[in-house]
Swiss-Prot record:
This is Uncharacterized MFS-type transporter MJ1317. The keyword Transmembrane helix applies. It comes from the Archaea. GO terms for molecular function: transmembrane transporter activity. It comes from Methanocaldococcus jannaschii (strain ATCC 43067 / DSM 2661 / JAL-1 / JCM 10045 / NBRC 100440) (Methanococcus jannaschii). The keyword Membrane applies. It is a multi-pass membrane protein. It holds the Pfam family MFS_1. PANTHER family: C-METHYLTRANSFERASE, MAJOR FACILITATOR SUPERFAMILY TRANSPORTER. It is found in: Cell membrane.
């Protein structure tokens, strides 16, 4: 009798584990749709801004504000999610908010409107990210690197399709930037379908956790890692500067190609990002997050140095490919490392704090990059290279 009950409990636990692991794929497909939508917009956003009168500082402002707004919300939403032990409602609200502001961005006709609505669109990311990542970490606790790698691979596969669609719409249908953004907004609303099937891990609300206690209870190693991540973020300014660098170089060669080729290079970046996200996540499960992150930060520094001094038509292909590899090394593994270093009851708070600190530094990062660009583009990328390599070396001391 006891054995039979034990077997039934084991079977029930296995079924629950399978249900939870499905969450990773459902959230991955949600990310696929969202990034298809977002990445139809992202490669053309810097061109949209410059076409309506914005300059490098405008690009720096929108690049910084987008990350600042999204990340500043994450610690508060993460804390609220831990407090009430609810994840899914915040995830749904986040994706819905993003889609609504994409729609308004598509109706915008000025650089100021592009800055405002593009920045507010990232509120959605700030609302959904920490609770979503907490669901992933609770669904695959023994293989976090693989879990976040799967989510990141879906995310980036959607990005490849989205930026490819953007390129095809321009090449063959001659759609305007605004038309492409409106189509992207419609796709964004489709993210709500797979979210319906996500199941939360049941757990009681934790009224004992206050915001201050949640932050105070974070381990010293985690706080140190978040500090180093902030230093790295100062080097990791907006992707738009990489597209702008390629566009300005190609303008000398062919004005028409200066629009098409940067989008194609951005697709190449996403292909390498998607291809290596899961392998590098699995690698971090085996050899440790810190080792993989150190390599990622240093590779990013080398890429930034390449954009400063080794620009040619052929080198742009190599540099955008390495840019994708660098992101595959550090993007998902940063979140996995934060999850490793935090307990389950404060995990969303820890992830939220990580994103918020990163967000606070992303605004000055892109503004500094925009200011340095006015001196020379080389200065922007040299600054990024030095800080990234320093960050990689600092990880060795955790």
């Amino acid at each position: 009798m006891v054995r039979k009950v034990a077997e039934q409990n084991l079977q029930k636990n296995n079924e629950n584990d399978r249900e939870l692991s499905k969450n990773v794929y459902l959230l991955g497909f949600t990310s696929f749709l969202n990034d298809m939508s977002s990445e139809m917009i992202m490669p053309i956003l810097p061109m949209l801004i410059t076409s309506v009168g914005g300059g490098s500082l405008s690009i720096g402002l929108v690049g910084g504000l987008r990350e600042f707004i999204s990340n500043i919300l994450m610690v508060l939403i993460g804390y609220c999610s831990d407090k009430v032990r609810k994840r899914k409602i915040f995830v749904v609200l986040g994706y819905l908010t993003s889609s609504m502001f994409k729609l308004l961005l598509g109706l915008s006709k000025s650089w100021l409107g592009a800055v405002i609505f593009s920045s507010l669109e990232r509120m959605g990311k700030g609302i959904r990210t920490a609770p979503r990542d907490a669901i992933i970490s609770e669904s695959m606790p023994k293989t976090l690197g693989k879990g976040f790698g799967i989510q990141r691979a879906f995310d980036t596969a959607g990005a490849i399709l989205g930026s490819t669609l953007s390129l095809l719409f321009i090449l063959y249908l001659q759609y305007s930037f605004n038309q492409i953004i409106l189509i992207a907004a419609v796709i964004g609303f489709l993210t709500l379908i797979p979210l319906y099937f996500v199941k939360e891990k049941p757990s009681p609300s934790n009224n004992k956790i206050t915001f201050r206690v949640g932050i105070k209870n974070l381990p010293k190693e985690l706080k140190l890692f978040i500090l180093i991540s902030a230093i790295f973020t100062l080097s990791n300014f907006s992707y738009m500067f990489y597209i702008l660098r390629a566009q300005e170089f190609l303008m000398i060669v062919d004005e028409k190609m200066a629009i098409i080729i940067p989008i194609a290079l951005y697709i190449l970046y996403n292909i390498f990002y998607a291809t290596f996200s899961i392998p590098f996540g699995i690698l971090s499960d085996k050899i440790g997050r810190k080792s993989v992150l150190t390599i990622g930060y240093i590779v990013y520094g080398i890429v930034s140095l390449g954009f400063a001094y080794f620009i040619s038509q052929k080198s742009l292909i190599l540099l955008f490919a390495l840019y994708g590899i660098a992101y595959a090394l550090f993007a998902g593994n940063q979140k996995a490392y934060v999850s490793d270093l935090s307990s389950e009851d404060i995990r969303a708070t820890a992830l939220g704090l990580f994103y918020t600190v990163v967000g606070l530094t992303s605004l000055p990062a892109s503004l500094i990059a925009g200011y340095l660009w006015k001196i020379s583009p080389e200065m922007t990328f040299l600054y990024g290279s030095v800080l990234a390599i320093i960050s990689g070396l600092l990880l060795l001391f955790i």
